[in-house]
Swiss-Prot record:
Highest taxon listed in the record's lineage: Eukaryota
Biased composition (Basic and acidic residues): 455-480
Tissue specificity field: Preferentially expressed in flowers.
Record gene name: RPN3B
Name of this protein: 26S proteasome non-ATPase regulatory subunit 3 homolog B
Amino acid sequence: MTQDVEMKDNQTPTQSVVSAPTSTLQNLKEIAALIDTGSYTKEVRRIARAVRLTVGLRRKLTGSVISSFLDFALVPGSEAHTRLSSFVPKSDEHDMEVDTASSNSQAPPKHLPAELEIYCYFIVLLFLIDQKKYNEAKVCSTASIARLKSVNRRTVDVIASKLYFYYSLSYELTNDLAEIRSTLLALHHSATLRHDELGQETLLNLLLRNYLHYNLYDQAEKLRSKAPRFEAHSNQQFCRYLFYLGKIRTIQLEYTDAKESLLQAARKAPVASLGFRIQCNKWAIIVRLLLGEIPERSIFTQKGMEKTLRPYFELTNAVRIGDLELFGKIQEKFAKTFAEDRTHNLIVRLRHNVIRTGLRNISISYSRISLQDVAQKLRLNSANPVADAESIVAKAIRDGAIDATIDHKNGCMVSKETGDIYSTNEPQTAFNSRIAFCLNMHNEAVRALRFPPNTHREKESEEKRREMKQQEEELAKYMAEEDDDDF
């Protein structure tokens, strides 16, 4: 079997080498034709379709294919052709022969639309980032942004939003993200004036990411609150916005709103974006712990997340038990992981929740217990643990975390009997929150449905066309009758 396979490979060595770049180049030419048509007819959906098709070809892009496509799409010797060709490695003679033969089969467009030139910047930038040539990608992305500033056409907006993203990514990968903040602000201002809503979405998220990268949460919130909001055009951008909003709300101690934003971002994110959903779940777990909730075990056992969420699973277990010593050990064990995830400061806040959880378990288990035993069970390592335990119990009683009293004379905590929870409003509140969640999900699903654009206008135009045709027929009949009368 091995010999047969080797013989087949040896019989047609050129076909296996030639077919891949030829088909990819042909696909790029079809995309160029689609962009040319979209530019001529001013149909944004054609440009959007071209971008989606390019994402599918991303892994097949090679230096020889891109070089041949640049020769096909751009005018040889032009400024754009010279600049972009300098970023692409020179192909060998064999590939050049194949590309030349295939390019002769289809003539290049007579005119060069701005959309096609911007698209060439886009695929070259994709290629450079995939090849990990980040410094060259910075130069290419900067040139593409400079070219974009001179173009004011709505058909470019879809490609421009992609260029904005990779422009920021190239600077982030080289640790120079602060350099482009003023440029992003200027671009966002221009997009707002031009009513480019997709560009506004993308640039707002990039600015929020820029601020949060340097822990500038106050500036991020000021920008977010003053930026114009509208119906989301891209699900990916909306998910990113919810994630950044959840992080800002968490730092501002608004845990309820943060939890809602983070869970919604994780739920709306595409299945393929595993890394993004993991980040959302990490922050959502911490926020739920800060709210006094214990996340379900199923969250930690999701496909592809078991290993990365393991530190947070052990942390959740320590909080659930209320063991302060175990919590400290886990905090030290995974300190590097928490620092990389930028959740270390939030985990420090959890110490108070661990103590309260342990105290709640003690109050449920014992109707009467001395403060010294409380300090031992909570493992308070301080100079005066009894006084600390008394202070902790007093604060928990004041905040309503436990239903108990302190017997100062005997130095003990006396727990009250737990009443019937169904006689309170808690079940009604929980049921109301679940119903509200289901209704919101239904409304979001309805809003997310796609309807053909301008359907009512098409009906009107068909009716008008029918009326005009009927009027023309009546006019022709009337003129024919007049001619008969003349004769």
